């Protein structure tokens, strides 16, 4: 059992960059989601940490799995939902600050239900980190 179990929705981020010379909007791809960020930070600090979530069977889901494995986050409790995408969001910037637009309705993580949660893993975790 992991010392720290992080449960929440990872989302692929597209963060707006300054316009290019031709005026087009450009976006930098990244990984977002409070629980994913916390899991990575804990793993980098030497903690035994696992993610509990669902990802789509898509490039974004594969990207998160690769990131967590590279960072030392246990992915044994990460489900793949072949019928739903991994959530994404966009960050845009203007004179009033930055603004978020989420596209997560029907995402793999949003479809998790109580019956999908492994009770033994939840009971065995020293810390359960949630976001929502």
Regions from the language model: what does each represent?
Residues 1-73, 112-114:
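Glycine-rich phosphate/adenosyl-contacting loop at the front of the ribokinase-like
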């Amino acid at each position: 059992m992991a010392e720290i179990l992080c449960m929440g929705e990872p989302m692929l981020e597209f963060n707006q960059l300054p316009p290019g010379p031709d005026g087009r909007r450009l976006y930098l791809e990244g990984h977002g989601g409070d629980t994913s960020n916390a899991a990575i930070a804990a793993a980098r600090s030497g903690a035994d940490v696992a993610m509990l979530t669902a990802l789509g069977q898509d490039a974004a889901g594969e990207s998160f799995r690769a990131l967590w494995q590279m960072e030392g986050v246990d992915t044994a409790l990460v489900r793949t939902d072949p019928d739903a995408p991994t959530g994404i969001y966009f960050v845009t910037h203007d004179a009033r600050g930055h603004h978020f637009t989420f596209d997560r309705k029907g995402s793999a993580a949003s479809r998790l239900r109580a019956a999908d949660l492994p009770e033994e893993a939840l009971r065995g975790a020293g810390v359960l980190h949630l976001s929502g």
